[in-house]
Amino acid sequence: VRIAFVHYPGRLARLEAARSGEGPTEFLFGAVQLERQGHAVSHHEVDPAAPAGRLARRLIDRQAGLRRLPPHTSAAVLAGTRRLLPGLREADVVVATTTGTAVALASWRWARRLETPLVGIVAGLLNDPWGRARRATTLPLLRRMHSMLYGPGEAPGLEALDPRLGGRVHVNRFGVDTAFWAPGGRPTGGVLAIGNDGHRDWATLVAAAPDIPAEITVLTRHEPPAALPANVRWQPADWHSRLLGDDEVRDAFRAAAVVVVPVKDVPQPSGQSVTLQASACGRPVVLTRTRGLWDPDVLRDGENVLLVPPGDPDALAAAVQRVLDEPAAADALGRAARATVEAAAHVDAYAARLLEICERARARP
């Protein structure tokens, strides 16, 4: 199958390392696995920060900001995907790996500029309320692609929007490369929190910090609050600009006594990749139990993860304290976390499911 992947920047720079085994493969969304199986895979990138004309920004970006256009609609991404159309027409199926690229390419399908079947990896479409204008502009696009979600939390809401979306909404739980993310060495102690998505609940972690008797390292591109507790180190880390390499992230996971993933209570999965990567490294994880929990039947509190209520600093601090106070139980939690990822969250299974969804898109564009 000829499969064209359309990404935001940062993926192509990691492609050769992923192919050679020197870097993790999950950041290519299963493409490396499909390539190894003999499928013809191509990669393309679109920069949402590219310059766009003043008129385009006013007509598109401003209207999207007012929630009159589909979520994540962008003049720059529409222009960037338009330039890719000739090459994408040669593929059997296109996989858009972000909500922004999915919305843009579905727009070109709606305009009949692209006939190639489209699979869009989307998240957060329902985070903000939909008015009549957003509904009128978004539903026609959703009917022109197959939407792939990372967890079941958003699926009922999407399917309820329009009966014609039946069979077009699919769940494919994220999987990670357990050959790269693997245990190594002994932890040196401390608490690690890492992540850049907009749903990280850093405020709750900072509020919990005074009750955590350990140094807390936060790695993120987000700005720190004005006042930090004495035991919190806030360091810049940006995946796209590679301020921190994948091997350095792995070393940080391995060194941590516990990895904390505080997230806000939203319906989309958040903190998924960090949780799975840290778990694959055999580290105990404290994770917020949200509406968007991607695999509630597999993530079992006290067995392979510690789950805490959203926005509860006391519960978060108590869970971290529990891990720090009980090293034997923490080791058992980490071993169970690694086994769970190997059994239920491997990138190979993610790639196989993606191929299945691509075939469904080809059968029903």
Regions found by a protein language model. Name each.
Residues 315, 322, 329-344, 350-353:
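A short, well-ordered alpha-helix in the C-terminal region of glycosyltransferases
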Residues 143-159, 164-181, 188, 196-199:
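Donor nucleotide-sugar binding/catalytic pocket of nucleotide-sugar-dependent glycosyltransferases
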Residues 26, 187-249:
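Conserved catalytic-core segment of nucleotide-activated headgroup transferases in glycan assembly
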Residues 1-49, 89, 210-211:
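N-terminal subdomain of nucleotide-sugar transferases
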Residues 196, 299-313, 322-327:
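Conserved acidic donor-binding segment of nucleotide-sugar-dependent glycosyltransferases
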Residues 227-228, 289-302, 306-307:
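Short acidic/histidine- and often glycine-rich active-site loop of Leloir-type glycosyltransferases
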Residues 253-270, 283:
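Acidic donor-binding loop of glycosyltransferase active sites
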Residues 82-90, 125-147:
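Membrane-proximal helix-turn-helix segments that form the acceptor-binding/catalytic region
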